[in-house]
Each structure stands twice: as C-alpha cells, then as structure tokens.
UniProtKB/Swiss-Prot annotation:
Substrate binds at residues 136, 312. Its cofactor is pyridoxal 5'-phosphate. It holds the Pfam family Ala_racemase_C. It is an enzyme of class 5 (isomerase). SUPFAM superfamilies: Alanine racemase C-terminal domain-like (SSF50621), PLP-binding barrel (SSF51419). This is Alanine racemase. The modification N6-(pyridoxal phosphate)lysine is found at residue 39. Pathway: Amino-acid biosynthesis; D-alanine biosynthesis; D-alanine from L-alanine: step 1/1. The lineage of its organism: Bacteria, Bacillati, Bacillota, Bacilli, Bacillales.
Length: 384
C-alpha cells in the first residue's frame, strides 16, 4: 500500500459500487449485459479498482474515453473486453488489436486508412457509433453507414462487434427528445445489412428508466458510483443508489480571531466577534475550487462554513468551538447525522455531480474499502 503524508484523502467504498452494479444486474431484463464505464480514472474513483469490482458484481465489459485509458487498465491486469468510446488514430489499430481493445468507428475515410496500415491477422473489433441527435461523434448518413459496413466486411481482421448511440436527454423528465432519438436509432439500424452481436444505447439514465428499450447491453457510468444522472429524475429511479466517494481532511492549525481580523487573500472575510478559525490542507490545486468559498464542511458532527478565499493548497473554516489539531473534517460524506453529498457540492458550484469527483485531483490519495476494511491505498504523487 502507498503511504501519504498530508492529512487529506478520498475514501472509495467499493462495496457501494458492487451493490450498485449488482442491483442493476437484478433490475435489467435477463440477458442484458452491463458495460461499466470507467473513463476519467473511473470518474475520479480509481480505474482498476472500480473495474475489478464492477466485473465481480456482474458487469461483463468496460468502456473508457481513449486508448491510453484502455492500455492503462491492461497494464494493471484488467483482462475484460474494453471499448474506447472516443476517437482513436488509425495508426493505433495494431496496438488496439494487440491488447484486445475494441475501437469506436464513425468515418469511412478513417477506416480506409486503418485498413491500409494494418497488415496483421489478429482480429480488431469495432463498434459503429450512430449520431441520433447528440451532435458529437457518430455517423448520420445511410450511404456512409453502408460504406463503413462494407469496408469492415472486406477486411477480414476487422470485426463489427457492436453498434450504438448516445442519448442527450435521458436524464430529463420530459421524454420527447429521448423518444425521438430512440426512434431514429431504430430506423438507422436498418441501414446495416445485419445487426452486429452487441446493440447498445442506454446510459445510466436510460438503463434505470427505460430498461425495456436497452437492446442487449447498457453502459453504466454515473450511477455505478451512486449518483443520480440528474436531480430531476432522482425520485424516478427504481432503487436507491449508494454513493461511493467521500473526501476528508484534518485540522492542521487552530487560532482565535478578534473582531475585525481578516482571513485569506484579498482580506475578504472579517471576523465579527471572537471566532475560532481552523486551517485544513486542501485547496484549489486539489480540485476544491475557489467557488466553494461560503460553502460548508463537517467537523465535530456540525456544519462549519468555509471563510476567506480558498488557497492553492489550504483553506480556512469557522469552527463552532475550539477543537484540537488533528480533528477530522469531512468535505464530502457523513459525520453523525449530517451529510454533505456530491450533489450538494455540485449545486453550490452550479454544475453537475459528474464534475465533482473528476475534479478532485491526483494529489489527493484514494483509500479503497472493501468489506468495510481498507483494501488498498493509492497515492499518485511521486509515481513516475
């Protein structure tokens, strides 16, 4: 296990991730596969640790954003099928084939170049991305779709393993655009001479709300980590999700301020009475952003406001009473009856819950818990 020497850390509850995947496994129609989405270091939770847990809980495949993320999982011993959801270079097809990594394809000219560069015999699997209304990646034209299918068919090492699309509004209460995209996908599937083995369109929101329209695989991302795809549909979810990510620190200094004394850069906070101020070693360089000034944390089971501007490596909080150095501070998570959720942080920042754990950076070690015990400690600082 890695060591760390700053009293700020993330705790990842792998039991929660296991339960979220296992609950989805039970909820989905029989025969529906789960592709666990572990891009962006598993949304800040730890890619290999989450991948292994998800596979154990019933996922059969993994998805990442780009090839480097897939290769990193292979180096960490993850052997399950992996799909790269984003764009890849045609020059890297051989590398993907060598490591049994499936690539997303959506352009015939890309595929022509890849076929001219790849002279190997090892099969390379592709998933065709269709743009049904997201406007990001994906083929939209029938003739282009048929060209891609024909190119794959003419190049024997190439295998069309799957076809998919992505919903733009499955996390909204209004389902009009979702229904439009779904109908569009059904229509576009008929452009192919035959359907490949895997057909997938459902993200977390669609998998949990419209499991009858999931084809034979779903991509389970945000809700694997215990987070609702949006606050609006949280009451509509079929079962309770278990949040896996919590963030903690400790008081490293406690001081008493007199009325009129100031705190932090810009002297934007002024003590109104005698106040106890605590310093904790986390700042915007760790992803605890300056906009979280005036937010609160938990200390001694009570809420304590963040006062003054958040610094690069530290921030200050107003304590309810004098507390000893070393007292635990919870920035995300539970203390006693009080809870600060990722959704609470996202609401204060005016963003979505996805962004919060992704933003907590590499300087903050991750402690992984499984079966209520520490399984691993991972500190990325100093790792080459």
């Amino acid at each position: 296990m890695d060591e760390f020497h700053r009293d700020t850390w993330v705790e990842i509850d792998l039991d929660a991730i296991y339960d979220n995947v296992a609950n989805l496994r039970r909820f989905l129609p029989e025969g529906t596969q789960i592709m666990a989405v572990v891009k962006a270091n598993a949304y800040g939770h730890g890619d290999a640790q989450v991948a292994a847990t998800a596979l154990e809980a019933g996922a059969s495949r993994l998805a990442v954003a780009f090839l480097d993320e897939a290769l990193a999982l292979r180096k960490k011993g993850i052997d399950a099928p992996i799909l790269v959801l984003g764009a890849s270079r045609p020059e890297d097809v051989a590398l993907a084939a060598e490591h049994r990594i499936a690539l997303t394809v959506f352009r015939s000219d890309w595929l022509e170049k890849a076929s001219s560069l790849y002279n190997g015999s090892t099969p390379i699997h592709f998933h065709l991305k269709m743009d049904t209304g997201m406007g990001r990646l994906g083929v939209k034209d029938e003739e282009e779709t048929k060209r891609i299918a024909a190119l794959i068919d003419r190049h024997p090492p190439f295998v069309l393993e799957g076809v998919y699309t992505h919903f733009a509004t499955a996390d909204e209460v209004n389902t009009d655009y979702f229904s439009y995209q779904y109908a569009r996908f059904l229509h576009m599937l008929d452009w192919l001479p035959s359907r490949p083995p895997l057909v997938h369109c459902a993200n977390s929101a669609a998998a949990l709300r419209f499991s009858d329209r999931a084809f034979n695989m779903v991509r389970f991302g945000i809700s694997m980590y215990g987070l609702a795809p949006s606050p609006d549909i949280k009451p509509l979810l079929p079962y309770e999700l278990k949040e896996a990510f919590s963030l903690h620190s400790r008081l490293v200094h406690v001081k008493k301020l007199q009325p009129g004394e100031k705190v932090s850069y810009g002297a934007t906070y002024t003590a109104q009475t005698e106040e106890w101020i605590g310093t904790i070693p986390i700042g915007y360089a760790d992803g605890w952003l300056r906009r979280l000034q005036h937010f609160h944390v938990l200390v001694g089971g009570q809420r304590a406001p963040i006062v003054g501007r958040i610094c690069m490596d530290q921030c200050m909080i107003r304590l309810p009473e004098p507390l000893p150095v070393g007292t635990k501070v919870t920035l995300i998570g539970r203390q006693g009856d009080e809870v600060i959720s990722i959704d609470d942080v996202a609401r204060h920042l005016g963003t979505i819950n996805y962004e919060v754990p992704c933003t907590i950076g590499y300087r903050v070690p991750r402690i992984f818990f499984r079966n209520k015990r520490i399984m691993e400690v991972r500190n990325a600082v100093g790792r080459g």
